[in-house]
A protein has these predicted regions:
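Acidic (Asp/Glu-rich), glycine- and aromatic
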Residues: 27, 125, 139-171
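Short, well-ordered beta-strand segments enriched in hydrophobic/aromatic residues
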Residues: 10-15, 129-131, 138-146
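Short glycine/proline-enriched turns and hinge-like loops at secondary-structure junctions
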Residues: 16-19, 121-125, 154-155
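Beta-strand-rich N-terminal accessory domains
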Residues: 1-80
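Glycine-rich, pocket-lining loop/helix-strand segments that form or immediately flank
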Residues: 34-52, 77-98, 169-180
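Active-site/ligand-binding surface loops and adjacent short beta/alpha elements
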Residues: 151-153, 161-204
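Hydrophobic small-molecule pocket/channel-lining residues, especially in calycin-type beta-barrels
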Residues: 36, 94, 115-122, 148, ...
């Protein structure tokens, strides 16, 4: 499956529908600098190599499901492991599945993934992800539609890897990050603007 290329006068974006609708390249054209981590030329486009991309989305849940099992609606739900490098299931199905291209223009693309609910996550749903370039910004939106006859809880995550350097910074008035270990997750407020900077690119 070919890669999708979007661009305007400032930015270039490359997406792999086959590899979980992940971003393989996102760069500043004028400065010739990568904003997201570029996909290595030594790696092949396969579903498990999305870990080496610059971004993927997580649907219908984000994070680790320990022991591949969770309790919901008075019963235990057993999930399949999503990635061979992970000891537990993680991040849902979307990041390791093929997505279909619904629409594409020079500066935008819309991709769809449908989970039938017959294996792993037990409910049927459709995820629609839209990428669009607007001047110096990349906008990503995800819409998840319940196609099942039963309601279910879900969570959507955006998982980028920024191409940073020792001088990198993030400029934000309200930024937090999740620190996790085997036992729990802790959300921390960023008190210093000197953590990251995305190679001094201004990213919205």
């Amino acid at each position: 499956m070919p890669l999708l290329s979007l661009q305007n006068k400032n930015l270039f974006l490359e997406i792999s529908p086959e590899m979980g609708a992940s971003i393989t390249k996102f760069c500043d054209r004028k400065k010739n600098k990568d904003i997201f981590r570029p996909f290595p030329k030594t790696k092949k486009i396969t579903k498990n190599n999305c870990y080496f991309s610059g971004y993927f989305a997580t649907v219908p849940y984000f994070g680790v499901i320990h022991k591949d099992t969770f309790f919901y609606n008075n019963k235990y739900i057993k999930l399949s492991r999503t990635h061979p490098l992970e000891p537990d299931t993680i991040h849902g199905e979307g990041w390791v599945k093929k997505w279909k291209v619904k629409k594409q223009t020079k500066t935008s693309a819309e991709l769809i993934y449908v989970h039938q609910g017959k294996s792993s996550f037990p409910h049927k749903y459709q995820a629609c992800q839209k990428f669009s370039l607007n001047k110096t910004s990349l906008n990503i939106s995800i819409r998840l539609t319940n196609l099942d006859h039963l309601p279910f809880d879900c969570g959507i995550g955006f998982h980028p890897w920024f191409n940073i350097s020792a001088e990198s910074k993030i400029f934000s008035n309200n930024f937090s990050f999740i620190e996790n270990n085997k036992n729990n997750f802790k959300q921390k407020k960023l008190t210093s603007a000197k953590l990251l900077n995305l190679n001094k690119h201004k990213i919205d």
